[in-house]
Regions:
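Active-site helical microenvironments for divalent-metal-assisted chemistry
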Residues: 1-187
Length: 187
């Protein structure tokens, strides 16, 4: 890849470092989209032995690129995001991806299509981990930062996404226990 094109891509992706998510970190600072994506990819890295028949390199690639559309629209919490918001983000992302050099434009387009279809083991795993990471981060954030709706949401979020995997179902149960303990402690 031509160095200046790589720099252009990286300058766009850098926006995710400044794009803040709805959730706080354990120290009470807003989490960035880049931080979420990094830890999501780290989760996939450490779970490769649990999913030996899954192309974990592909899952990690999905994790790394999944929120790039938020470079253009910012982060909108899932419970506030409308179909119009999703369409706008998808359109801006598609426009950006189409301007990437080959073969990256085709690879990213194929990954996004696979992620949206949620038909492959890789796409389903990426989506489940994406949602689980969000709940883990909420469990790590001060409870004073939670919205009232998040008390129930954090107990059920991702349940349907993990159902395909006994391991993820067990992980979700452990995360739910952490949520219940956090609510019980009130911290």
């Amino acid at each position: 890849m031509e160095p200046n094109k790589l720099l252009d891509i990286l300058h766009t992706a850098e926006r995710l470092k400044d794009t803040l998510r709805h959730c706080d970190t354990s120290k009470g600072r807003r989490e960035s989209v880049a931080e979420h994506s990094w830890r999501l990819a780290l989760m996939a890295f450490f779970l490769r032995d649990e999913f030996p028949d899954t192309d974990m390199d592909r899952v990690i690639r999905m994790c790394l690129i999944h929120d790039l559309g938020e470079c253009f629209t910012g982060d909108i919490p899932s419970f506030l995001k409308t179909d119009a918001d999703t369409e706008k983000e998808d359109s801006l992302l598609e426009q950006w991806v189409s301007g990437l050099p080959a073969p990256y434009n085709a690879e990213m387009s194929a990954l996004y299509a696979e992620m949206n279809a949620l038909q492959t083991p890789e796409a389903r795993l990426y989506k489940a981990l994406d949602k689980l990471e969000a709940v883990i981060q909420h469990n790590e954030s001060p409870i004073a930062t939670w919205l009232p709706r998040e008390y129930d949401l954090n107990l059920t979020y991702a349940n349907e996404n993990v159902a395909f995997s006994p391991y993820l179902t067990e992980l979700r149960a452990a995360i739910r226990r952490d949520t219940e303990e956090k609510i019980q402690r009130g911290e």
